[in-house]
Amino acid sequence: MTRSISISVLIISVLIMIYVITRTSISNAYPIFAQQGYENPREATGRIVCANCHLANKPVDIEVPQAVLPNTVFEAVVRIPYDMQLKQVLANGKRGGLNVGAVLILPEGFELAPPDRISPEMKEKMGNLSFQNYRPTKRNILVIGPVPGQKYSEIVFPILSPDPATKKEVHFLKYPIYVGGNRGRGQIYPDGSKSNNTVYNATGAGLVSKIVRKEKGGYEITIADASDGHQAVDIIPPGPELLVSEGEYIKLDQPLTSNPNVGGFGQGDAEIVLQDPLRVQGLLFFLASVILAQIFLVLKKKQFEKVQLAEMNF
């Protein structure tokens, strides 16, 4: 009897552990929605696929150095601005703070800097962020999030530039960098279904004959077609505010709820030059030559003026 109880307790413990691990992986899977559905986050049109779920258009900004030398670590700063006072609708229908996330698409050869190459000052700017590659084979595409927007509306990516001496496919050129950044939850899930962070429209026209408030939040709205009496039931999840009432006549696709979304997605780009050190040295040598030539010219002119003055006095 004791043995069977011990086995039962062990099985229950294992099941609980599996549940916790599964729930954790699901909650952490949000940043990789795009990774699961798209081989490349940037479409041929230039659109970043995050816009398929985050429908509202919002600004995003990226700041990188104008030029970098090979095999050096630099900062790519992504800013995702929004009103910190705003609250979004959470999955349970309650209100909470906004999260942010970003995808950074670097040129081939550029990648996340290893921890031992990141300076203490840069680590302090990064905070406790954990970046990941979009794919194991796409080390030049980085993703982060969701992370609290109150703390990380400015995200510092530590980037290592490539060295053409060791990577033959890399050249000393000007390269584009693309970024996408979102604040708040999306309106559509990757499977195409709506989240509770969007507006819900009527699936039919007619009389709102009944509205039932569900125990866990949300509504069931029954719409009776005036022509044939056919009834359609629209399910509204908890979160959006209801705009219609019983006895009201509505049209097809008329909004049944408000739009609770306060976030959105934006994308931008920047350019960076992978600079050849020999070119820099050549430029410095040229500038030094010009300066020396100017100095010698001034000295020669003064010497000539002294000679002229001496001849005049003579």
From Swiss-Prot:
It comes from the Eukaryota. Gene3D superfamilies: 2.40.50.100, Cytochrome f large domain, Single helix bin. Residues 1-29 form the signal peptide. Binds 1 heme group covalently. The keyword Electron transport applies. Keywords: Chloroplast, Electron transport, Heme, Iron, Membrane, Metal-binding, Photosynthesis, Plastid, Signal, Thylakoid, Transmembrane, Transmembrane helix, Transport. Pfam families: Apocytochr_F_C (PF01333), Apocytochr_F_N (PF16639). InterPro entries: Cyt-f_TM (IPR024058), Cyt_f (IPR002325), Cyt_f_lg_dom (IPR024094), Cyt_f_lg_dom_sf (IPR036826), Rudment_hybrid_motif (IPR011054). SUPFAM superfamilies: Cytochrome f subunit of the cytochrome b6f complex, transmembrane anchor (SSF103431), Cytochrome f, large domain (SSF49441), Rudiment single hybrid motif (SSF51246). Heme binds at Y30, C50, C53, H54. Its cofactor is heme. Its main location: plastid. It is found in: Plastid, Chloroplast thylakoid membrane. It is a single-pass membrane protein. The chain crosses the membrane at residues 280-300. GO terms for cellular component: chloroplast thylakoid membrane. Component of the cytochrome b6-f complex, which mediates electron transfer between photosystem II (PSII) and photosystem I (PSI), cyclic electron flow around PSI, and state transitions. This is Cytochrome f. It comes from Illicium oligandrum.
